């Protein structure tokens, strides 16, 4: 007698590739691209990302085994802030902390590793490595130059990208999880991807030959004291350099390029030790809050286009509340002011229990 063995009647493939893209790999000819018997797949409407609470649950299990004394809620939310719950990125950061950072000169044991400083060190390792996911992100930008252009405008100018489901480049970027759609606009999917993209744009050969990048590199040694960034001095030197190089340029040039030029000036100063990114909820044509991660410390600098004193005061209040989120007492502002009577320079003001360093160029 034959044994009866149950067999599957159907197979579900859950993947970042939809069935049409698998078919393109097998049959790339253009004339049959959309009319194909392969177009039979149903949407797999399952959110594969982790929530902060789900990350916390995994950390709790780890803590039960290793007793690190970590602040589970804080670490879980920090991991989520950088990854938006992208499973591979969450796993990779935790791997770095568990396997690569613990028992090193910087982190003597697991207790010292599972801290905010340890998470930021793991983020730095992830951004510096080559892995298939981040390599694929770069490949997609090379494959779709138009996508690269619109993402550059999003990152540096705060330009809104309306979601168009017929845009092949954006559609593919969304399918691979590199971008997401919120309120019918395209956003970078998470902070890790965004920081990697900033590094790509700021460290390419063209930008490294930019004169303001060269000025940042030439002056970099004076900006770090005992491992800490002197952001006030960075702003002072940037104001001097920018005014000298571009002070007579047209308003539209400064509005479009000013914030990118500050990041270009900053990048050689922090490169190798730190990174920077923009909080997406603050990004628009008028302002964006730049977060600088440097040597496990964080600095917040609002980059904005000047629109009068009342707008400036609201910006100060917004920055003050944002500092509360990061548990910081000092913040920085850089305003690109088109008023001919403006006073160029840097000053400090007190706002409640916080100090704001304001630079005007």
Regions found by a protein language model. Name each.
Residues 1-34:
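Sensor-1/coupling segment of RecA-like P-loop NTPase cores
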Residues 26-48:
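A short helix-turn-beta junction within AAA+ P-loop NTPase domains corresponding to the substrate/partner-engaging
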Residues 44, 51-176, 182-183, 211-221:
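Winged-helix-like regulatory helical subdomains adjacent to P-loop NTPase cores
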Residues 131, 193-227:
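Short, amphipathic alpha-helical interaction segments positioned at domain boundaries
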Residues 237-277:
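Acidic-basic catalytic patches of nuclease active cores, encompassing PD-(D/E)XK
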Residues 262, 290-292, 296-307, 322:
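Conserved catalytic cores of phosphodiester-cleaving nucleases, focusing on short active-site segments
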Residues 268-296:
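Active-site metal-binding core of divalent-cation-utilizing nuclease and nuclease-like domains
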Residues 312-316, 323-352:
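Nucleic-acid nuclease catalytic cores
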């Amino acid at each position: 007698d034959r044994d009866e063995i149950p067999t599957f009647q159907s197979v579900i493939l859950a993947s970042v590739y939809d069935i049409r893209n698998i078919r393109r790999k097998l049959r790339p000819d253009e004339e049959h691209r959309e009319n194909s018997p392969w177009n039979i797949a149903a949407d797999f409407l399952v959110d594969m990302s982790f929530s902060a609470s789900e990350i916390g649950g995994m950390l709790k299990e780890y803590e039960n085994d290793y007793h690190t004394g970590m602040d589970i809620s804080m670490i879980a939310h920090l991991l989520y802030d950088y990854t938006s719950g992208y499973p591979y990125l969450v796993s990779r950061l935790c791997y770095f902390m568990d396997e690569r950072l613990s028992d090193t000169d910087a982190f003597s044991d697991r207790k010292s590793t599972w801290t905010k400083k340890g998470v930021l060190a793991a983020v730095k390792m992830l951004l510096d490595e080559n892995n298939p996911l981040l390599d694929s992100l770069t490949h997609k930008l090379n494959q779709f130059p138009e996508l690269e252009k619109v993402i550059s405008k999003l990152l540096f100018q705060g330009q809104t990208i309306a979601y168009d489901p017929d845009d092949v480049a954006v559609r593919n970027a969304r399918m691979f999880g590199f971008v997401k759609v919120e309120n019918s606009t395209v956003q970078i999917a998470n902070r890790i991807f965004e920081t990697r993209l900033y590094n790509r744009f700021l460290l390419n050969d063209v930008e490294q030959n930019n004169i303001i990048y060269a000025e940042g590199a030439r002056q970099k040694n004076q900006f770090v004291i005992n491992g800490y960034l002197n952001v006030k001095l960075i702003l002072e030197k940037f104001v001097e350099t920018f005014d000298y190089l571009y002070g007579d340029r047209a308003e539209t040039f400064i509005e479009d390029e000013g914030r990118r030029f500050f990041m270009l000036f900053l990048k050689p100063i922090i490169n190798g030790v730190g990174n920077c990114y923009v909080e997406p909820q603050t990004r628009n044509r008028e302002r964006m809050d730049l977060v600088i991660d440097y040597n496990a410390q964080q600095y917040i600098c609002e980059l904005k286009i000047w629109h009068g004193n009342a707008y400036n005061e609201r910006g100060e209040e917004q920055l003050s509340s944002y500092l509360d989120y990061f548990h910081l007492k000092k913040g920085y502002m850089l305003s690109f002011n088109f008023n001919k009577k403006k006073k160029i320079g840097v000053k400090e003001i007190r706002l409640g229990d916080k100090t704001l360093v304001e630079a005007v160029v």
